Amino acid sequence: MGTVHDDATMPSYYYYVDPAGPAYEPQQPNPIDDLISVYGLQDISRQVARTNADGTKAVKLRKSYKNQIQDLSGKFSVIPTRENGKGGEISPIVFQNTDGDAVRERGMGPEEWRRAQVFRDQALFEAPTMDWDMCAEVISQFERSYPGEFKNQGFEVEDLAFDLDGSGANGAALGGKAKKRKSRSNGSSMATPNSDLQEDIKRRRLE
């Protein structure tokens, strides 16, 4: 005679299977079968094999990203990180996620709460979290590597498209001669503020 279990005596790790329900059907094809043979992929498998039958190296499928772009012009540097020893402690600070909104403590007034919201990220840019000496060192490394990209572009009033003197003409022309500035690049792939400027800058005066 079988033992009858109710909900009170049945262990929680048992589950009920309805005999009237649909029967279980095993997965097809079985993942433990030789799927290469099942689907007739032997030829493709031999073409993309990493090693030959005798153990020698065959086709190299994977290439590093640097090898894929080596035919492009320009210089490509390793991003400074803590692991490669080029960025020190700066990378985890720059790329870390912030916690979001500040926590409103009990008894905090409206003005205190507003200041907490305004300055909630201030600690990220102060010691010991941010090492500004390390930031200056990393920037100087890029300046030495890409002097053409980090040269002092300078700011000139004629860069603004405003009628500053009320004459109806902007500052693009000084002394009756149009001043053209060229932004030269050394072929670097780095994005700099003036790297996308055309050689002949055309400015429009705002009406």
From Swiss-Prot:
Q: Name the domain of life.
A: Eukaryota
Q: Which GO terms describe its cellular component?
A: core mediator complex; mediator complex
Q: Name one GO molecular function term.
A: transcription coactivator activity
| Stated family | Belongs to the Mediator complex subunit 19 family.
Q: Provide the function of this protein.
A: Component of the Mediator complex, a coactivator involved in the regulated transcription of nearly all RNA polymerase II-dependent genes. Mediator functions as a bridge to convey information from gene-specific regulatory proteins to the basal RNA polymerase II transcription machinery. Mediator is recruited to promoters by direct interactions with regulatory proteins and serves as a scaffold for the assembly of a functional preinitiation complex with RNA polymerase II and the general transcription factors.
PANTHER family listed in its UniProt record: MEDIATOR OF RNA POLYMERASE II TRANSCRIPTION SUBUNIT 19
Q: How does this protein assemble?
A: Component of the Mediator complex.
Q: What is this protein identified as?
A: Mediator of RNA polymerase II transcription subunit 19
Task: Specify the species.
Answer: Eremothecium gossypii (strain ATCC 10895 / CBS 109.51 / FGSC 9923 / NRRL Y-1056)
